[in-house]
UniProtKB/Swiss-Prot annotation:
Family: Belongs to the adenylate kinase family.
SUPFAM superfamilies listed in its UniProt record: P-loop containing nucleoside triphosphate hydrolases
InterPro entries per the UniProt record, alphabetical: Adenyl_kin_sub, Adenylat/UMP-CMP_kin, Adenylat_kinase_CS, Adenylate_kinase_lid-dom, P-loop_NTPase
Catalyzed reactions: AMP + ATP = 2 ADP
A GO CC term assigned to this protein in UniProt: cytoplasm
Entry binding sites for ATP: G10, A11, G12, K13, G14, T15, R123, T132, Y133, K200
Protein name: Adenylate kinase
Gene Ontology process terms (BP): AMP salvage
Pathway(s): Purine metabolism; AMP biosynthesis via salvage pathway; AMP from ADP: step 1/1
Oligomer status and interactors: Monomer.
Keywords for the protein's UniProt record, in alphabetical order: ATP-binding, Cytoplasm, Kinase, Nucleotide biosynthesis, Nucleotide-binding, Transferase
Record region (LID): 122-159
PANTHER family according to UniProt: NUCLEOTIDE KINASE (PTHR23359)
Length: 214
């Protein structure tokens, strides 16, 4: 069961990835984690990647594809894997296909931009403990104060509205074209493409996923 997850930041991919990992016993592969692990393991590819990252340079698509191939040949990927955050662009998707990395399911989580802004801009965090709140979905007992300590809550820079909108713009420009790409692939019999309404409750989406994936 080889799965690619698509969806804007804040669309709920992480929550559903956890559900699929637990249910199907497959690992989630995020390129960031993979690059760090390969660099730490000191493999030839990992050392190449580390050299580039240490110099503040982008790791090439070719090198990432090689790392993906190396990672998915590991024992824990025998039943399959979840790719999150890769591919991000059409050239990366093409390179993956050329490298012979087949995919069974592409799952898109669709949430309108304004809902994502509301989700992320409403998050509040207690710096000392990492406790998180949401002004709409999980508000603190006293506005902007931590329930336990009474300390002020803060907004993470990543959750600032301007940052969220920038990330959404990048997603729409770079990654959204993959939706059409993978729909086309599915039309040619290369895997299945499924779109989920990310505004539904977590349990409903999980149940829909289980129906699709079996």
């Amino acid at each position: 069961m080889r799965i690619i997850l698509l969806g804007a930041p804040g669309a709920g991919k992480g929550t559903q990835a956890q559900f699929m990992m637990d249910k199907y016993g497959i690992p989630q592969i995020s390129t960031g984690d993979m690059l760090r692990a390969a660099a730490k393991a000191g493999t030839e590819l990992g050392l190449k990647a580390k050299e580039l990252m240490d110099a503040g340079q982008l790791v090439s698509d070719e090198l990432i594809i090689d790392l993906v191939k190396e990672r998915i040949s590991a024992e824990d990927c025998a039943k399959g894997f979840l790719l999150d955050g890769f591919p991000r662009t059409i050239p990366q998707a093409d390179a993956m296909k050329t490298a012979g990395v087949a995919v069974d399911f592409v799952l898109e989580f669709d949430v309108p931009d304004e809902e994502i802004v509301k989700r992320m801009a409403g998050r509040r965090v207690h710096a000392g403990s990492g406790r998180t709140y949401h002004i709409v979905y999980n508000p603190p007992k006293v506005a902007d104060k931590d329930d336990v300590t009474g300390d002020d809550l803060s907004i993470r820079p990543d959750d600032e509205e301007s940052t969220v909108r920038k990330r959404l713009d990048i997603y729409h420009t770079q990654t959204e074209p993959l939706v059409a790409y993978y729909k086309n692939e599915a039309g040619q019999g290369n895997g299945e493409y499924h779109k989920f309404d990310g505004t539904k409750t977590v349990d409903v989406i999980s149940a829909e996923l289980a129906t699709v994936l079996g």
